[in-house]
């Protein structure tokens, strides 16, 4: 899995510090309320709660100055992966990079492509070794 600026904490839109009213409205429709009124639903849609030893490897890519998805959200998911599953997951945080940096062919977007290629190649090579394929 390679989420680029993925959403990992669905309670963030309800935060008084960083509110996101549009996201909060959608989440209220999905869960039928807020994290306080429908905690079970929010637990079910929180990716960190589903991490196990069977979780596939992740390459998490996140801009450090992303105003929509706080980098701490991605870091928290990374820590969940590390605590429950150590299977070749990686976290790449990009200094001074905002949300949606890959929409236009910027230098940053171009530099990410070889990183993703190398990550996938490493996973493939590990799979080949595990299977005993030559």
Regions found by a protein language model. Give the residues of each.
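C-terminal catalytic histidine-bearing segment of alpha/beta-hydrolase fold enzymes
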Residues: 61, 71-134
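Conserved serine/cysteine hydrolase catalytic core
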Residues: 47-55, 72
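Hydrophobic pocket-lining residues within nucleotide cofactor-binding pockets
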Residues: 8-10, 47, 97
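Active-site nucleophile loop of the alpha/beta-hydrolase fold
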Residues: 2-12
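Acidic catalytic loop of the alpha/beta-hydrolase fold
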Residues: 10, 65-69
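Short beta-strand/loop motif that positions the catalytic acidic residue
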Residues: 54, 59-62, 66
């Amino acid at each position: 899995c390679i989420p680029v600026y993925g959403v990992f904490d669905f309670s963030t839109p309800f935060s008084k510090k960083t509110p996101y009213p549009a996201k909060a409205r959608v989440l209220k429709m999905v869960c039928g309320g807020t994290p306080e009124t429908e905690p079970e639903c929010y637990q079910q849609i929180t990716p960190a709660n589903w991490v196990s030893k069977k979780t596939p490897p992740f390459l998490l890519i996140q801009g450090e100055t992303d105003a929509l998805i706080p980098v701490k959200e991605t870091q928290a998911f990374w820590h969940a992966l590390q605590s429950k599953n150590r299977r070749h997951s990686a976290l790449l945080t990009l200094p001074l990079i905002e949300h949606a940096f890959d929409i236009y062919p910027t230098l940053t977007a171009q530099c990410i492509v070889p990183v993703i290629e190398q990550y996938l190649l490493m996973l493939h090579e590990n799979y080949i070794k595990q299977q005993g394929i030559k």
